[in-house]
C-alpha cells in the first residue's frame, strides 16, 4: 500500500447569518416595535482523529472544505439557525499545521481527539437588539461576520510497532513482503521504496505486530541528503527497529560500518531514535562463501547489546528465529507500556 504522508487542504468556516430589519404589525402598537431576529453563527471546521483511517489518500482528490453558513434572522424575533460544523476525519497520528506559518495546531494522537481549525462567523444582530429608550424603532441591523479560512497542512507520522531500517537494497521490502501480506514493488536498485509500506505480522498467540518498511537511508540523511528528513520522520513513533544489513559482499561495505553509519544518522536527527530497541538482521546469507562471518557478527553485536540473527529471504533460512525474536521484543515493549 502506498502511503501519502502529507496533504494540503483549504478550510472555510461558515459565515454568520445577517440580522433582520423587521417591525411588528400589531393593532394598537403605534408604528410597530422592532422585531428583526439575529443571524445564526456559521459552522466551525473541525479536524478529528479516527482510528479506522490509515492514510491521507482521500485528500489527494478533495482539497477544499467548507462548513455551513448560519441562516439569516427573520421577523417576529426569529433567530437564524446556526450552521452545522464540518468534521474532517484523519488518521490517528496526524499532525495539523497552519500551512502559511508552520504553527502546529494539534498533534492528534488518540481516537476522537479534535481541533477547531476555522471558527464560524458570528451572526449579525437584528434591529430588535438595537432598540433603546431613545431609539424605539431602529431601522438597521448587522451583517454576519465571515467565517475564518486558511490553508492547513496535514502530516501523518506513520504509527507502527516496529520500523525496518537500513541502507537501500538491504532487503527491507523483501522482508516485509515475506513477513506479511504486503506486496511492495521490489527491484534491484536503491530507493526502490519511495514511500513507507505497512505490513502486519501475525503471531502464534493471536496478536499482530505492525511493521513499517522505512525507505532506505543514506549517509547524510540527517542533513536532508537523498530523501533523508522525509524518511527519518517516519521512524520517530515506532517502538523498536529491525536494522537490516546486507552481509553478502563485505568488499562493498563492511557490515559493522553500515550499521554505525545508519545509527549515526539516527542520532544526529534525534538522540532518542538510537535509544529504541534494535534487532540486527544480517541478510543474504545464501550468498556467503564463508559462514564464519555469522558467528563473528553475532559476537560483535552482542558486545554492543544488540540481538543478531542471520537470514536468507530467498531460502527463508533464519526466518523462524527472526519472527521469534520480533515476538520477544514486542512482548517486552507491551509489558513496559502496561506498567506506564
UniProtKB/Swiss-Prot annotation:
Keywords noted in UniProt: Cytoplasm, GTP-binding, Hydrolase, Magnesium, Metal-binding, Nucleotide-binding
Compartments it resides in: Cytoplasm
Enzyme Commission number, as recorded: 3.6.5.-
Family statement: Belongs to the TRAFAC class OBG-HflX-like GTPase superfamily. OBG GTPase family.
Subunit structure, interactors included: Monomer.
Signal peptide extent: none
Gene Ontology BP term (one): ribosome biogenesis
A GO term, aspect molecular function: GTP binding
Names of required cofactors: Mg(2+)
Domain named Obg: residues: 1-159
Entries under HAMAP family matching the protein: GTPase_Obg
Keyword S-adenosyl-L-methionine tagged: no
Residues at which Mg(2+) binds: 173, 193
PANTHER family with a match to the protein in the record: DEVELOPMENTALLY REGULATED GTP-BINDING PROTEIN-RELATED, MITOCHONDRIAL RIBOSOME-ASSOCIATED GTPASE 2
InterPro entries xref list: G_OBG, GTP-bd, GTP-bd_Obg/CgtA, GTP1-OBG_CS, GTP1_OBG_dom, GTP1_OBG_dom_sf, OBG_GTPase, P-loop_NTPase
Highest taxon, organism lineage: Bacteria
Residues that coordinate or bind GTP: 166-173, 191-195, 213-216, 283-286, 312-314
A cellular component annotation (GO) from this entry: cytoplasm
Name of protein: GTPase Obg
Record's keyword annotation contains Hydrolase: yes
Pfam families given in the database record: GTP1_OBG, MMR_HSR1
Top-rank EC class of the record's enzyme: hydrolase
Amino acid at each position: 500500500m502506498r502511503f501519502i504522508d502529507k496533504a494540503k487542504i483549504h478550510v472555510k468556516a461558515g459565515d454568520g447569518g445577517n440580522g433582520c430589519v423587521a417591525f411588528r404589525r400589531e393593532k394598537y402598537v403605534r408604528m410597530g416595535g422592532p422585531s428583526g431576529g439575529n443571524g445564526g453563527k456559521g459552522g466551525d471546521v473541525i479536524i478529528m482523529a479516527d482510528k479506522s483511517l490509515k492514510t491521507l489518500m482521500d485528500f489527494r482528490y478533495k482539497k477544499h472544505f467548507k462548513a455551513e453558513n448560519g441562516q439569516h434572522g427573520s421577523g417576529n424575533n426569529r433567530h437564524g439557525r446556526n450552521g452545522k460544523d464540518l468534521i474532517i476525519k484523519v488518521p490517528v497520528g496526524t499532525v495539523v499545521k497552519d500551512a502559511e506559518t508552520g504553527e502546529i495546531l494539534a498533534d492528534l494522537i488518540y481516537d476522537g481527539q479534535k481541533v477547531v481549525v476555522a471558527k464560524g462567523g458570528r451572526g449579525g444582530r437584528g434591529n430588535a437588539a438595537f432598540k433603546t429608550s431613545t431609539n424605539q424603532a431602529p431601522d438597521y441591523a448587522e451583517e454576519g461576520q465571515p467565517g475564518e479560512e486558511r490553508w492547513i497542512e496535514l502530516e501523518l507520522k506513520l504509527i507502527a510497532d516496529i520500523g525496518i531500517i537500513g541502507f537501500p537494497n538491504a532487503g527491507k521490502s523483501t522482508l516485509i513482503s515475506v513477513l506479511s501480506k504486503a506486496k511492495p514493488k521490489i527491484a534491484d536498485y536503491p530507493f526502490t521504496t519511495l514511500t513507507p509500506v505497512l505490513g502486519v505480522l501475525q503471531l502464534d498467540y493471536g496478536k499482530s505486530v505492525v511493521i513499517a518498511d522505512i525507505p532506505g537511508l543514506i549517509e547524510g540523511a540527517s542533513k536532508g541528503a537523498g530523501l533523508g528528513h522525509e524518511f527519518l520522520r517516519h521512524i520517530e513513533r515506532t517502538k523498536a527497529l529491525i536494522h537490516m544489513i546486507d552481509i553478502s559482499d563485505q568488499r562493498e561495505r563492511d557490515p559493522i560500518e553500515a550499521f554505525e553509519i545508519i545509527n549515526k544518522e539516527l542520532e544526529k536527527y534525534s538522540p532518542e531514535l538510537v535509544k529504541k530497541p534494535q534487532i540486527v538482521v544480517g541478510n543474504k546469507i545464501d550468498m556467503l562463501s564463508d559462514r564464519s562471518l555469522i558467528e563473528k557478527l553475532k559476537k560483535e553485536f552482542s558486545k554492543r547489546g544488540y540481538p543478531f540473527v542471520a537470514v536468507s529471504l530467498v531460502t527463508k533460512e533464519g526466518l523462524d528465529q527472526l519472527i521469534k525474536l520480533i515476538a520477544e521484543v514486542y512482548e517486552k515493549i507491551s509489558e513496559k507500556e502496561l506498567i506506564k
